[in-house]
Structures are given as structure tokens and as C-alpha cells.
């Protein structure tokens, strides 16, 4: 599941909030306002692009709904583009990820994103769209979260209370906004409106993580407009809350290679990394622990860590999988200070992006899947953090549950390429395996040792596979697509302390 993201507002965005309200009054639903600019590619050649605002109803179910802006950009394909090639609509993840700064920002991430967009020129037109409610050309809906206490361990009870409080705070903070208009159906409607405004009959979809869920919503609610799709780190409409045993299996796959890394051998207990995980679970299930550490300003801070904090920690440091074994082994050998510092940072008040829980509460979960979640054999290890707060607070958020008719998969003949890593702990690989039977024209590429990443990053060592994906987007041809890709074993990080003389658990020491 995606995290309830912390807000980040790029500097160039702030000026956009000064745009006069009359700019919206001059437009009607479905209008676009476009500016034309140019960037230079890696060869120094000028590439023209359009950047603009799509004006859409905040809630299409209400005739008097106010208009909101959604940012988008388009890079047109070369004149040599094959006639009839559908444009690729690139859907960002998150939710709560602004991306249009890639045209002007100079940081490495923005430059890499722009390079990836320009590469789509070999397919045809590329259209990038941001997300309603968190877009550089419209509203950025956030609230300030409340801090969590240091003097008791993290708990599901506190998490539920925090989620419910956030829902009430969101409604109070935006009395002039219709927050019920931020359901997954409205996100899908924005794609259809932009397609129509730009004059396309059919489109292709490209997205990962929430972008994949967004794409699946478009295919479910507007199937006639989609020619084909490429989705990665897949999050099905009924899988917003991850099955704990599927997530745990991803950890087991990382541990398999870590157990065979010579550099980690001196730190491993008998039974390997998963034995360390089990020992940590037993340790923190027995009693919480108070850890004292120094903050950046030198001040001492004490924080209580318990079983719930450990359950959440087991999934930290997994995006960069090479870091995870060293993190777990540090905890196993009772080096808690760095972890305590991370938890303390997470407990501080920070801005929260609202479109995540608004979209999640609109999708919810089927009764059958909720039963599986609550009876999953890995709950003891990972807890109910991934879903309890969302389910308990769903009625507090203004978006309406769209029901099983939308979230449960149906058979579709849209050709889709799924790309999924088996080390993904945010959207486990089983998500793709469960969806594949509903896509008779689907093709899955399973990436061994792939994490929660975008399609082309997962295929970074496979140029032929990348070209085959571009070819699929251009023509629909699947013959060159592999079934499986294997990434090399990563160079696992080593704990920052010297190996113990024995890999047995050291005696408890005062913190």
C-alpha cells in the first residue's frame, strides 16, 4: 500500500497560488489553457512541449460543482510517428506526487524524469497529467498532522485515532472545497476529459504504484478509450491494503540472498535473517524498550519503542533492498539509536497530503478480502498497520465507497503489460499474479530482485526488454517481451559496528 505521504511543495509552485480566481471564471469544464515552451535534450537539440491546466468539475455528480485545475504537459512525437499510434498518458504515483517541475528543475531526479519522458518520442505523443488535489496548477490539499507521544510505544489505537482526527481536520480546513470529489472515479474522469480536450480518440496508459491503480480505474470505468497499457508495481483496485503474508514473502526473498552474502555472515544468527526477524518480534512482543539518543542539536531525547514500532520497522529500508539486512541486523544486535531517531522523526507533526486517504476510502476493500486480511498468518509479524486506520476511518472521509462493482476485477480484452519485482514490499508481486487471469491479452514480466520501482528502472539492465516495451506501446506487439528478468545480487550494506565475536544475541544492555 502507498504511504499517507508527507507534503513537499517545490519552490516554483508557490507562485502558482497567486493566480487570480478569475482565471477559473474564464473557463468551463473540459477547457484547457496551454503554454508552449522548449527544453534541450542530452544532445543539445531543442524539444518543444506544451504545459497547461485542465479545468474539471471538482465533483462531476453535482451540477453546481466548482471548477478545479489539474496540471498536464504534452511532448508531441516526431513527424515520423506511425499514423494511428495512440498517445501515451503517463500517470504519476503517490498519490501526492507533483512532476511538472521536471521541465524546469535542475536536481538529478527531475533531470532523470525528463530524460525518461523524452525517450517516449520513439513511440509518439506523451501526455503527463498530475493529480487533482495535489497539482502545481491547482489545489495542494494538505493539513498539519498532530505529533505522536514519545512516552509510549506506537499503537494501532493511536494510528486509528490519528486517521480519524485527520479526516475531521481536513473537513474543517477546507469548508470551501468539496472533498467528496476526490474519489478514484473522478481521477479516472480527469484522464477522459484531458483525452477529449487534446483531441484523441484512444490512448495508452503508463503508470506505476498508484499510477497503476489509476490506470486500472480508467480501464474499468472508461474501457473504450484505452488501446493498451503498461503498469508496474501493480496495485489492483481491491488491493489498496496489502496481504501481510504476501509482503512477508517479499522479505523472505530478500533474506534468501542476504543469508548467502559473505559480508553479512559474521552478523547473522543461526537460521539467518528471518531468524533475526523472529527473535526481534519475540523481544518486543515481551516488553517495550526505552531508547535514549541525541538529536541533531545535541539534545537528548527518550522514546519508547514497542511491538507496533517493530512491525512498521520491518518494512522500512526495503525500497533500497541492499540496506534492509544491515538495518535488521543492527536491531537484532541491540543497536537501536538510529532506528529510534527515525521513529522520533516520524512522530513529529508534518503536513499530510489528503488525496491519499480520500482515494483509498473511495475504493475501500471487499468483505471477502477484509476477512483474508484480518485472518492472515503474517499478522503477528506485521500487524494491521497497513489497513486498520484506513478501514476504521473510512466513514469519516467525505469520499463515498464505490463498491465491489468497481473494485473487483472483471475480464477485459485490453492488452496490458505488467512489470513487477518480487522484492516489492509496497505492492507485492502477488498483486500482478492475481490480476493476470482477468487480462487474457495480458503479459507479465516478473523481475527477480526488483523492488517497488517504475517499469524502466526495473528493466535497467535489459535494453532489449525496454525496447520491446516501447514497441508494445507503439504497435501492441508482444513477441519481444520477456517473461522474467533477473537483476544481480546487490552489494548488501554491512552494519556500522564491528561483527560480534559470536552471532548469538548479546545480553540486554541499558539504553
Regions found by a protein language model. Give the residues of each.
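Short alpha-helical "patches" and their helix-cap loops
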Residues: 234, 323-343, 371-380, 486
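Bacterial N-terminal signal peptides that target proteins for export
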Residues: 2-13
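Bacterial N-terminal signal peptides
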Residues: 12-21
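The N-terminal extracellular segments of secreted preproproteins, especially immediately downstream
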Residues: 1-3, 21, 360
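Gly/Pro-rich cap/lid or specificity-loop segments adjacent to the active site
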Residues: 26-304, 358-511
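Long, low-complexity segments enriched in small/aliphatic residues
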Residues: 334-367
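P-loop NTPase catalytic cores that bind/hydrolyze ATP
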Residues: 302-335
Amino acid at each position: 500500500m502507498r504511504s499517507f505521504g508527507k507534503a513537499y511543495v517545490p519552490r516554483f509552485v508557490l507562485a502558482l497560488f497567486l493566480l487570480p480566481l478569475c482565471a477559473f471564471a474564464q473557463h468551463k469544464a473540459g477547457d484547457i489553457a496551454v503554454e508552449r515552451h522548449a527544453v534541450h535534450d542530452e544532445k543539445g537539440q531543442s524539444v518543444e512541449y506544451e504545459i497547461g491546466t485542465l479545468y474539471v468539475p471538482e465533483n462531476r455528480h453535482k451540477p453546481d460543482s466548482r471548477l478545479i485545475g489539474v496540471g498536464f504537459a504534452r511532448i508531441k512525437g516526431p513527424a515520423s510517428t506511425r499514423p494511428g499510434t495512440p498517445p501515451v498518458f503517463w500517470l504519476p504515483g503517490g498519490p501526492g506526487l507533483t512532476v511538472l517541475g521536471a521541465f524546469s528543475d535542475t536536481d538529478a531526479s527531475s533531470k532523470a524524469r525528463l530524460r525518461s519522458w523524452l525517450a517516449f518520442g520513439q513511440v509518439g505523443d506523451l501526455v503527463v497529467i498530475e493529480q487533482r488535489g495535489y497539482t502545481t496548477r491547482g489545489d495542494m490539499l494538505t493539513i498539519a498532522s498532530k505529533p505522536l507521544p514519545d512516552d509510549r510505544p506506537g499503537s494501532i489505537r493511536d494510528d486509528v485515532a490519528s486517521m480519524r482526527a485527520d479526516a475531521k481536520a481536513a473537513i474543517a480546513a477546507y469548508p470551501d472545497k468539496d472533498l467528496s470529489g476526490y474519489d478514484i472515479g473522478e481521477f479516472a474522469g480527469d484522464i477522459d476529459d484531458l483525452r477529449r480536450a487534446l483531441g484523441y480518440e484512444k490512448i495508452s496508459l503508463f503508470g506505476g504504484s498508484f499510477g497503476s491503480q489509476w490506470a486500472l480505474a480508467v480501464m474499468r470505468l472508461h474501457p473504450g478509450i484505452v488501446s493498451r497499457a503498461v503498469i508496474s508495481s501493480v496495485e489492483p483496485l481491491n488491493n489498496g491494503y496489502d496481504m501481510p503474508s504476501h509482503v512477508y514473502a517479499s522479505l523472505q526473498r530478500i533474506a534468501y540472498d542476504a543469508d548467502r552474502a559473505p559480508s553479512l555472515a559474521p552478523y547473522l544468527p543461526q537460521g539467518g535473517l528471518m531468524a533475526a526477524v523472529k527473535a526481534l518480534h519475540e523481544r518486543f512482543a515481551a516488553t517495550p524498550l526505552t531508547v535514549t539518543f541525541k538529536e541533531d542539536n545535541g539534545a537528548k531525547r527518550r522514546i519508547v519503542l514497542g511491538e507496533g514500532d517493530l512491525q512498521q520497522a520491518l518494512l522500512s529500508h526495503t525500497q533500497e533492498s541492499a540496506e534492509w539486512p544491515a538495518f535488521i541486523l543492527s536491531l537484532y544486535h541491540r543497536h537501536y539509536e538510529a532506528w529510534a531517531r527515525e521513529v522520533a522523526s516520524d512522530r513529529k507533526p508534518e503536513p499530510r497530503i489528503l488525496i491519499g486517504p480520500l482515494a483509498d476510502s473511495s475504493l475501500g476493500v471487499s468483505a471477502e478480502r477484509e476477512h483474508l486480511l484480518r485472518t492472515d498468518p503474517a499478522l503477528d509479524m506485521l500487524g494491521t498497520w497497513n489497513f486498520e486506520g484506513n478501514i476504521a476511518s473510512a466513514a469519516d472521509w467525505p469520499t463515498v465507497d464505490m463498491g465491489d462493482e468497481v473494485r473487483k476485477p472483471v475480464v477485459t480484452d485490453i492488452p496490458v503489460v505488467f512489470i513487477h519485482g518480487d522484492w516489492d514490499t509496497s505492492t507485492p508481486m502477488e498483486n500482478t499474479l492475481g490480476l493476470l487471469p482477468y487480462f487474457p491479452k495480458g503479459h507479465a514480466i516478473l523481475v527477480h530482485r526488483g523492488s517497488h520501482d517504475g517499469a524502466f528502472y526495473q528493466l535497467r539492465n535489459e535494453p532489449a526488454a525496454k525496447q520491446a516495451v516501447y514497441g508494445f506501446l507503439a504497435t501492441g506487439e508482444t513477441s519481444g517481451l520477456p517473461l522474467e528478468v533477473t537483476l544481480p545480487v546487490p552489494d548488501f550494506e554491512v552494519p556500522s559496528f564491528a561483527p560480534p565475536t559470536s552471532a548469538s544475541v548479546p545480553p540486554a544492555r541499558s539504553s
